[in-house]
Amino acid sequence: MKKLSYLFILPLCLMASSCTMMVKGIAKLVVKDYNDYTHINISNIQLIDAKGNKKQFNELFTGKTVYLYAWDNKRLSVEQEKSYRLLQERFAKYPDVVFANLNIGSDTASNAFKLADDGATSKFRDLLKIGDPAPFIIGKDGAILAYKGPKPADNILVDYVLYEARNGENGTKSAKQLIKGVNGNEQFKTAKLRDWYSSHFSKNPDDKLSFSVSTTN
């Protein structure tokens, strides 16, 4: 996994404003692929739970926005587990958001869903070419709103993208809105973003904002 730290305090930059623009430009390049598969709907794929029960995705998650964390044989590290748990805690107050784990490898010990072998599910499996654990944000209608989306450790970004997905917004659009919404003083430009941050995190924004953007192999 390559990780681009979206930190506005970069000592190698001569001018803070130009540095901010450079980092924002790099971040936009990373998030532009989140919406590659918004035309794909996975409502009808079959998932198998840890007890061997098989159900369709839309039966399991009716009316829910799903943060679907998938991995092959490379499981989450201790740090990844921690950031994932903290993300779940922050979204516990939203009843329309759920978190689900999906194992596409040979790990039989994990408490995660696995994919069935029917035709519709096989098409989704073909999209899951991942080396590192990767999140997929699924909308309430079953559309893939964020493909290899922001990871739990992607501070602020993952929260905003998942929050906006509750209203059907695709990951690229919401991520770019957030990135664009930070000014040269490392602060939110709009009252809307400041209010969202205060409500979601239950605190006022820091004087110097920082967040990160991760790519998935």
Give a label for each model feature:
Residues 64-65, 78-102:
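Conserved helix-turn-beta segment immediately C-terminal to the redox Cys motif
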Residues 15-18:
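C-terminal motif of bacterial Sec signal peptides marking the signal peptidase cleavage site
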Residues 1-8:
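Bacterial N-terminal signal peptides that target proteins for export
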Residues 143-217:
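Thiol-/selenol-based redox modules, centered on thioredoxin-like
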